[in-house]
Amino acid sequence: MQDVPVDPPQRVLIGSRAELEAALLLLISRARRQLRVAAADLSVLSLGSLQPVTAMRAMLLARPGNRIHLLVDDMAWLDTRAPRLRSLQQDFAHALRIRCADAQDPVGHDVVAIGDDLDALRLQPTVGVVGEMWCHNGTFAQPLVTEFDRRWEHASHDQSSQPLGL
């Protein structure tokens, strides 16, 4: 992945899985208050992997008021393939909130990650990994924030951090 330019607004193109992982880690590290992520099941962003979970943990530990909101269509991937992320949710149940999107307004092919209303990563709905990340660009991030917040409010309740079995 190319280095982020010095002067805002800053655009970084994403064309491979390695560039996506580097961009996501950069976005998480730049977030100072809130991180919002929306994807059908979060697997495309590999949020269950060690590095993103470690970065999210560091973000949540940095300030008591920091928040992470994850919006998904299908909880199956989180329940079966993301034990690190679920463990993080158990440790930070007050700050890491996960919701399942409304069936009438699914996330679908939209894959976005937004940090602090200024930085945003968006992937295109293609077979390969193609997307872009903008830093210090509220003009690019604001429509994504509005769309995310609308879906978040219409989504179901927060998903439990503990299994609800007997």
Task: Describe each PLM feature range.
Residues 1-25, 30, 127-128, 140-158:
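N-terminal localization/anchoring segments of enzymes in phospholipid and broader phosphate metabolism
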Residues 1-11, 29-41, 94-103:
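Short charge-dense sequence patches
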Residues 13-14, 46-49, 134, 138:
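Flexible, glycine- and charge-enriched loops at secondary-structure boundaries
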Residues 27-92:
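Primarily the HKD phosphodiesterase
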Residues 35, 97-144, 148:
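HKD (HxKxxxxD) catalytic microenvironment of the phospholipase D
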Residues 40, 122, 153:
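Residue-level marker of positions within ordered structural domains that often coincide
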Residues 57-66, 99, 128, 152-153, ...:
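Extended interaction regions within the primary functional domain
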Residues 159-166:
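Charge-patterned, long linear interaction tracts outside catalytic cores
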